[in-house]
Amino acid sequence: MKIAIAGASGRMGQMLIDTVLRTPGVTLAAALDRAGSDAVGQDAGARLGKATGVIVTDDLRTGLSQADVLIDFTRPEATLAHLEIARELGVGVVIGTTGFTAEQKASFKDYGATIGVVWAPNMSVGVNATFKLIEVAAKILAQGYDVEIVEAHHKHKIDAPSGTALKMGEIVAEAQGTTLAERAVYAREGETGPRMNGTIGFATVRGGDIVGDHTVLFVGEGERIEITHRSNSRQSYAEGAVRAACFLAGKKGLFDMNDVLGL
């Protein structure tokens, strides 16, 4: 399996490159970065202290032509542009980017008609196991429990709430026969009045180098249940993304991490 990495100079890009280099059965075929990046022209492993023989390039088409699958943790506009070229070249895409609009996410199905696409707001195996626990809890605690979701990330994250937090909200809503759009409350300030029954509240924390913390609270009278996942490094995201890339071998269609993990 030949893998290309988008955003090669970023924190996640570097973790992905390192993970590909350490994973049997896969090779680093291309390392891609934006035009003007200091990394362009350097060995993809230079910042890791490893010589890979793969030079970082801003020529997306040439880079993708050497790969079977692209792993993309960049920004929505960049990812959509990458998808267009990947479709032309028949290259599968693993999308870890978050912050897409509902319309942009809906377009992934069109790409899946031609190439294999895995999109998930979080590639971590542990997070996806947490999703299952939340689904079970939401069904059991559908009556008499208020739901609040609290997430925390590093100060550089540009979207809020996180894609993972939104996915958690969707899971709760769907497990209880509703939609997140009907129930979500994204901000509270000033005199808000009593909490509205049936809402799903979100709280966002941004600071320092927090990799990613997510907690779903089911709060009843006299008790509360908290389901928490904490990421100590981006390694789990990278390993899940490489696993997803391997899953796409020979496949067309739109998939998520449930498909990759067989959940």
From Swiss-Prot:
Binding residues for NADP(+): 34
Pathway: Amino-acid biosynthesis; L-lysine biosynthesis via DAP pathway; (S)-tetrahydrodipicolinate from L-aspartate: step 4/4
Protein's recorded name: 4-hydroxy-tetrahydrodipicolinate reductase
Gene Ontology CC: cytosol
Location(s), subcellular: Cytoplasm
Keywords, in A-Z order: Amino-acid biosynthesis, Cytoplasm, Diaminopimelate biosynthesis, Lysine biosynthesis, NAD, NADP, Oxidoreductase
Gene Ontology annotations of biological process type: diaminopimelate biosynthetic process; lysine biosynthetic process via diaminopimelate
Single GO MF descriptor: NADP binding
Domain of life: Bacteria
E.C. numbers: 1.17.1.8
Positions bound to (S)-2,3,4,5-tetrahydrodipicolinate: 154, 163-164
NCBIfam families assigned to the protein according to its UniProt record, in alphabetical order: dapB
Keyword Translocase belongs to the record: no
Residues at the active site: 153, 157
Pfam family, one: DapB_N
